[in-house]
């Protein structure tokens, strides 16, 4: 059975939006984010505003799509190729497990539209907590360690 087929047939955890919201609130409480608010929330979707690394960004969560998507994190796409390669490296078995995104649990991708770079993580096997935390860790690594290389 393919991973897509098994993903669809697995029942969703209850209060998935609440779980993701609590994780993000935890990052705000611990000072990772300078600001955090829930803009809109239903049982199936949520939209958050996060102030982080001198930026205000939106994070969109869709339970049915099993995705979390950061709105514009980076603009000035001159380094899009390098950023795409870096995002792929985040899945590499060469990285230590605590710094790696396990492709059997989540898949991070970056997209370029209208001069801006967006990041989306797709949840696999309903591991929403893992995917949420890995998205935040990856974005943090990109913003702190890598961004100056691409400016």
Please report, for each region that a protein language model flagged, where it lies by residue:
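Charge-rich, low-complexity N-terminal segments
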Residues: 1-65, 102
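Charged/polar, solvent-exposed surface patches and flexible loops
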Residues: 18, 22-26, 88-92, 137, ...
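Short, flexible helical or helix-coil boundary motifs
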Residues: 27, 31, 90, 94-97, ...
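A generic structural signal for beta-strand entry/edge sites
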Residues: 45-47, 65-69, 114-118
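A short acidic-to-branched-hydrophobic micro-motif
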Residues: 55-81
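Short, internal acidic amphipathic alpha-helical interface segments
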Residues: 71-122
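A short acidic/glycine-rich loop-to-helix N-cap element
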Residues: 125-137
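Mixed-charge, glycine-accented linear interaction segment located at domain edges/termini
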Residues: 134-151
């Amino acid at each position: 059975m393919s991973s897509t087929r098994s993903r669809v047939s697995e029942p969703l955890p209850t209060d998935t939006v609440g779980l993701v919201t609590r994780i993000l609130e935890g990052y705000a409480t611990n000072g990772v984010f300078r600001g955090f608010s829930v803009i809109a929330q239903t049982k199936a979707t949520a939209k958050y505003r996060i102030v982080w690394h001198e930026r205000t960004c939106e994070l969109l969560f869709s339970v049915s799509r099993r995705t979390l998507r950061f709105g514009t994190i980076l603009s000035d796409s001159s380094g899009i190729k390098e950023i795409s390669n870096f995002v792929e490296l985040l899945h590499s078995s060469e990285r230590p497990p605590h710094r790696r995104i396990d492709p059997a649990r989540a898949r991070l991708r970056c997209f370029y539209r209208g001069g801006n770079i967006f990041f989306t993580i797709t949840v696999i096997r309903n591991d929403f907590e893992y995917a949420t935390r890995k998205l935040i860790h990856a974005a943090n690594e990109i913003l702190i360690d890598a961004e100056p290389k691409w400016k």
